[in-house]
């Protein structure tokens, strides 16, 4: 949600920020609605004040036995006027809100211009890509040959974009999630949190998933939503709160199932585990004071990078351009892992700062240490990492000519010392 005061102060700058994302100008229309609302509020307050004084005047006349008919008639008219003005204020409030909630966050000045992912900027690249002595295979070919990755049974059970993992691959997926959680909790200072996968509409709205992405999420018949990411319950846990400055930064991490309808993804990544309706993901969320959020964004991204470094997966950090930055983000770093089977870099983590965009939607604030009035917090979120995609990266980077997969050293303590996954 945007700050109306900032819009009123500089409507041209507001529209320029929208233009960076390819959005049409909106400031003049919203400012006009806001002027109408403020005028209606002033008129309402004047009428309410007059009603209060009128009540005293009528009472005084009645006590002296004088005629109060004219004043009583005025009171009737005032009541009608107040009711109409109250309706008008509510309608204008709703109209302004409807305009604001569909507008994306204002981008950081350092976000590069560009319409799509082709304009994203490589910040750095880490790790050497392995030189294979054989043609590397994609993860689904490896998994099916091992007899441990079953898309046919998943299709029978649930349809397309699901998978059944068995044996050592299922164990490796579990090991990856546990390894990531342990790293973030024990070394990075996050608090492990177990969250519901069903949330209410307010939680989805507050984390900017509604109304914009309603068609990309699953809604239950009773009006609740399956979470597309644990960012939703973690971030929404501070909705409506006023946190003490001493409680910041608040760092939380969760491993959860995530659910996405993948609307608009027809024909993309139809084979394998890259794009699924249900998947596991470790999510990091930080709640900070405004002055600390940029440093926290870098810190969070480094926490995600550490996972890839411990696993020995080559990766690169990308700064997303204006046209590729998500709706609620002010700035986003994507981490892309090298997948030799695809001969391509693929996103495995996305770390974003939303500044106060989500906080305004959910009224999440903190009280500064100097005793000043409450201010909106800043919220950040990042994948630490997507477990299924990390499994893909491990399989493709650690595959052997005979189709077996070497288990990375970092995962062996979680797999009872298993050194390699071979065909059953």
Swiss-Prot record:
GO terms for cellular component: cytoplasm. One of its GO terms (biological process) is seryl-tRNA aminoacylation. InterPro entries: aa-tRNA-synt_IIb, aa-tRNA-synth_II, aa-tRNA-synth_II/BPL/LPL, Ser-tRNA-ligase_type_1, Ser-tRNA-synth_1_N, SerRS_1_N_sf, SerRS_core, tRNA-bd_arm. Consists of two distinct domains, a catalytic core and a N-terminal extension that is involved in tRNA binding. The gene is serS. ATP binds at residues 260-262, 347-350. GO terms for molecular function: ATP binding; serine-tRNA ligase activity. SUPFAM superfamilies: Class II aaRS and biotin synthetases, tRNA-binding arm. This is Serine--tRNA ligase. Homodimer. The tRNA molecule binds across the dimer. It is an enzyme of class 6 (ligase).
